[in-house]
């Protein structure tokens, strides 16, 4: 009986805590930023669900309006990162890399990322104990 109680308590303790979930969401978002900054597809693969998509808006210099800038799929994101690495098109060393976790539920989470290209709102889901990015909505460039 003592062993059964011990195992039940152990299972409850081993289950991820809200603080661990938040750290894992932050890590997925940092992998996202660093994957694009460094051209590291391994970090992007660790961050994304294969069905991920990213859509965004870029501020038109002439009109000041934010125009739709297109959609990026998982495959396109990996190709973009490869291109960054091949061309050594890395951002400046002081480029922003900020992650703010907005909310974490049992299986869903949201975060705000600030990077050189602008602001991203990210939706994640937890599957098999791992937090992965499902959707990204962004606008840029960031206001100075």
Regions from the PLM with identified roles:
Residues 110, 119-143:
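Short beta-strand edge/turn micro-motifs at domain boundaries
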Residues 1-23:
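Bacterial Sec-dependent N-terminal signal peptides
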Residues 16-42, 46:
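Short, low-complexity N-terminal intrinsically disordered segments enriched in polar/charged residues
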Residues 53, 57-58, 66-117:
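Surface-exposed, charged secondary-structure patches
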Residues 23, 49, 69-70, 139-144:
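Ligand-binding grooves and catalytic loops that recognize ribose/phosphate and carbohydrate rings
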Residues 30-34, 48-62:
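Short, solvent-exposed secondary-structure junction/capping segments
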Residues 50, 106-107, 129-130:
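Beta-strand-connecting loop/turn residues
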Residues 32, 44, 52, 111, ...:
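Hydrophobic pocket/interface hotspot
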